[in-house]
Amino acid sequence: TGFNFATYNDWTKSVQRKYEAKYGRIKTTYMTSDKVPAHYCIGPARVVDVTHRVGTTDPKSWPASPAIRVEDVQAHEKLYGPIKAGEVVIFHSGHTDAHFREYQRGVEDPNTAAPLNGHTEGWPAPTPETINYVIDKGVKCIATDGPSMGSVNPEEAVMTHWAAASREVPFVEFLTNAGSLPASGGFFIF
């Protein structure tokens, strides 16, 4: 309501058709970033270690991001117990800690530009299925230490963002030092 999908360009409309065929109709919301309830971004932290995904894409497929899958979250749950409603899920890949550098004019940024340009592997990014899995558990905020929750692949990125936006769940991106938090028992405030 209030959003006109007809304003999307042809590429986005094509991705929208694929998304809706697989996941159902995209829902609209009036929850812009200024209207996200503060309590959504505060809660017990569950840090899902996905560092094992780093280095798993074939350089011939770049730009590409390793996919964070439901199985990764389930493996975390086997070790630390089920994710509970109200927890904040943080995906720890180590990407930003490893690649963030002070900007240098004329030098390709290794954190964001190089992966987007296909010169290095992208940051690990959750699939829409993974997003839906943690939201189904009652999670109201999802965070990552990557530059974006979405993959370096534009189609995958849009679908991941639509999965959360359709369910009014905000993302927090570009975290640093996520690996210094315990897998369970920490607390997140954004």
Where are these regions (language model features)?
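Active-/binding-site microenvironments in catalytic and ligand-binding cores
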Residues: 1-190
